[in-house]
Amino acid sequence: MLFNIFLYLFIFCIVSSGIKKYKKIHKNELSGPFPIPLLGNLHQLGKEPHYTLTKMHNVYGEIFRLHFGDVYTVVVSDPILIREMFVDNHENFKYRPLLPTFKFGAGGDHGLSLSNERWERTRELVQNAMKRTSIKKIYDMLDSQVYELIKSMKQYQVTGNPFEIHLYAQRFTLSIMFKYIFNEDISYDEDITKGKIAELVQPMDQIFKSLGSGKLGDFISIAQPFYYQWLKFSDKQFNGPFSTVKKFIYKRYLEHINTIDHDNPRDLMDLLINEFSNDKNLIPTILQTSLDMFLAGNDTTAASIIWFVLRMQEHPEIQLKAYNEIKDAVGDRDRVLLSDRPKTPYLNAIIKEILRLNPVGPFGLPHRSSNDIVIGNGKYFIPKDSQILVNYRGLGFNEKYFENPSQFDPSRFLNKNNDAYMPFGVGDRKCVGLQLAGDEQYLSFSNILLNFNLKNIGTPVSDYEEFGLTLKPNKFKVLLESRK
């Protein structure tokens, strides 16, 4: 009897799912691959969705639809359409889809990644906090961390041992986030495989992989409420890493509550406490916003540093040209300053080319359409509650905007702007920390090249590790040869 009930329920779900997917919804509905009941097109994504969706772009065009289970999903990789959606029609696309994984990751209704009206107040606070932070204080913080990174690398250069950048890049960006959010220093004398760094790196990596991959429970409507409860109480692989990082941040919150001087905020957490602590219901917003900034500010920038080292050892002629430009800019100085940026156009172009060829967040965070809308001069219909994915990798490989897109060619960004270059997103939900991230990238990239010739040790590197919210290369090593 029970078996028959489940069988009938299963058949009903398949039939209703098929009807929903195959029903024509609008005369200008988007094209896309044929979906199957329940799964939709999930089975076609494979283990490397960033490659799959770029291939689909070549078949179905710059905007197309997929069915992620029951979730109607729009994939866009055209800069004109992206700006029309997220700038001209910001109000319709400003919220996130209410999927269990992202709802859990956003702490329900809290933080910068939430999907309600409160995110605008939270985002404005964070933006104002970043503006109020002394430029000199930020620069001194960055300068100190760059110095420590170069010092660590010199130890490998002196001994001649091959150098692996991954953990050092994460320590560099984590140290900056520690100082900016918690006013806390990480000692560079600390063993990189132990202490605070090791305590956080592994769970943070797991979080980004889990958020990027998505699970079947996110996309089957009838399963979503049950899957959310599973994430909260049973899924140790997902809940465990979040719990580790949240406990870490909560401990800092308690320390700040006991030591805060409300008239002289030390860091971002003090500013958040000043803004939200009058309402106890908003304490989770303080914690979740700190978590969002901590995660976003670390992994994406660390990944870009890793990609930079990989691409430079692959292209010694480009590396040498950039070094000569940097050397001309700094003269006898032993370090590069942010004020040198206008004098290093080729290095600036290298940074853009790395972010184009290897976008660290291949899809960013998804958006949601609040209402039915037609875009592209009436050509493309997007239904209410669609999930919107910006295919940043597909955008960077769009031959309409980038000639020979598979080629690493920084010169494409010299003496001209390209409207298709948008690695930090556009509109009101673009990366809130893009200025800080850009400064981190410039100072780390330039000072690495000023000090070291990055040499290939002869071992081929396969491009990507396991797919996640951010993408990094598999671990690799380089030889560091002194430039002095």
Swiss-Prot record:
GO biological process: sorocarp development
CDD domains (UniProt xref): CYP1_2-like
GO molecular function terms noted in the UniProt entry: heme binding; iron ion binding; monooxygenase activity; oxidoreductase activity, acting on paired donors, with incorporation or reduction of molecular oxygen
EC number: 1.14.-.-
Alphabetic keyword roster: Heme, Iron, Membrane, Metal-binding, Monooxygenase, Oxidoreductase, Transmembrane, Transmembrane helix
GO annotations of cellular component type: membrane
Membrane topology: Single-pass membrane protein
Enzyme class name: oxidoreductase
Top-level division of the source organism's lineage: Eukaryota
Major location category of this protein: membrane
Pfam family, one: p450
Transmembrane segments: 1-19
Sites where the protein binds heme: C431
Protein family (similarity comment): Belongs to the cytochrome P450 family.
PANTHER family: CYTOCHROME P450 307A1-RELATED, HEME-BINDING MONOOXYGENASE FAMILY
Name by which UniProt lists this protein: Probable cytochrome P450 508B1
Organism this protein belongs to: Dictyostelium discoideum
Phylogenetic classification of the source organism: Eukaryota, Amoebozoa, Evosea, Eumycetozoa, Dictyostelia
Gene coding for it: cyp508B1
